Design a protein with these regions (language model features):
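Helical hinge/lid and interdomain linker segments adjacent to catalytic or ligand-binding clefts
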Residues: 29, 33-36, 40-129
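A glycine-rich, often tryptophan-bearing local segment used as a flexible ligand/cofactor-contacting loop or short
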Residues: 99-190
């Protein structure tokens, strides 16, 4: 669809906020040093080559962050020369999904986190390292890569309370990409303070049936996983934080592709979550164009960073409302 048509449809059908461009803020005198870690995915469906530049742009436009990218070797390749100096950075943003690391690299990252480092796990990063116990403590919950009841319980909200469920079974499911509503569960946390009680996210995968140790974990926001779309029927954690030693972790299950990363809700929570993971504080204000309970807010300048943007519907989700272009939220299930 052409941009004019997309704007017209969005305005008429959704009232979603579309922005042509967001100007960058002036750089901070002492910017937060960020490493984006990428280089591997569990499959071709997570295109880190496309999403890393988007994450970098979204962080740098705040003026708060100085961002470097560390691209790891692919699984099975030689890691002998991949020795990132984690201590140079206040926070590592993991846009990364691999099965394992050499023991010395795992020990280096564990030490970094225990001594006050920060981690932001984005979408596919909660699929990574299924057999690395310390990483699973860091991210709280995860899916796929052989995770099952040995990895920890399922976690979800029911009747307003966080439930740990020891039912046996494999971890990690999702339906087709579609818009969904997030419900804030901890409005007092710095990342969530000032955000709406409920808000719509642009078309994305909604992970369900995640499991893990859940140690020192606070769920910030959930979304209802609709059984009609291969869902669990539960309010599933989408945004959460944990602590690991002296380190802080922000985990977002959103962000499958550039389309999802173009959601203003994703952008704002990424920016705020990265600042919090690095410093324990959030200084950023809630923008006026933040999504509402019934409409998405969508950045065309971000979506256009995907070379497939002009193709319209995402072929992996051959159903209207599930692909690229403005989301089309239908009736939103009430949080339970």
């Amino acid at each position: 669809l052409q941009v004019k048509l997309m704007k017209k449809l969005t305005s008429v059908l959704l009232g979603a906020a579309l922005i042509a461009l967001t100007p960058c803020a002036a750089p901070a005198a002492n910017p937060i040093k960020v490493m984006i870690l990428d280089g591997e995915s569990g499959g071709t469906y997570h295109k880190w080559q496309l999403t890393t530049p988007v994450l970098k742009k979204e962080l740098e436009e705040t003026g708060l962050f100085q961002v470097d990218v560390a691209t790891a070797p692919k699984a099975g390749e030689d890691f002998s020369n991949f020795k990132p100096d984690f201590a140079k950075y206040q926070v590592v943003v993991a846009n990364y999904d691999t099965a394992n690391w050499p023991d010395d690299l795992k020990a280096s990252f564990e030490s970094y986190m225990k001594n006050g480092g920060g981690l932001v796990a984005v979408h596919a990063a909660d699929n990574a390292f299924g057999h690395w116990p310390e990483y699973n403590k860091m991210i709280g919950i995860g899916g796929w890569r052989d995770r099952d009841e040995k990895s920890g319980p399922f976690w979800y909200f029911k009747n307003g309370k966080l439930i740990s469920d020891d039912t046996p079974g494999r971890a990690g499911k999702h339906g087709r990409r579609t818009p969904y509503q997030l419900v804030t569960r901890d409005a007092s946390h710095p990342i969530m303070k000032g955000l709406p009680a409920a808000w719509m996210h642009q078309g994305d995968e909604l992970y369900n049936s995640l499991r893990g140790p859940g140690e020192h974990m606070t769920v910030l926001a959930t979304a209802f996983s609709d059984p009609a779309n291969a869902g669990s029927g539960h309010d599933e954690p989408v945004l959460l934080v944990t602590s690991y030693g002296k380190g802080r972790v922000f985990h977002t299950a959103m962000g499958h592709d550039v389309n999802a990363l173009a959601c203003v809700g994703f952008i704002v929570t990424l920016q705020r979550g990265t600042e919090w993971a690095a410093t324990g504080k959030v200084t950023q204000k809630t923008p006026a164009n933040f999504p509402t309970a019934n409409s998405v807010s969508y950045r065309n300048d971000i979506a256009e960073m995907d070379p497939l943007y002009k193709n319209g519907l995402n072929g992996l989700d051959a159903q209207p409302g599930a692909g690229r272009g403005p989301a089309r939220p239908g009736a939103v299930p009430a949080a339970k």
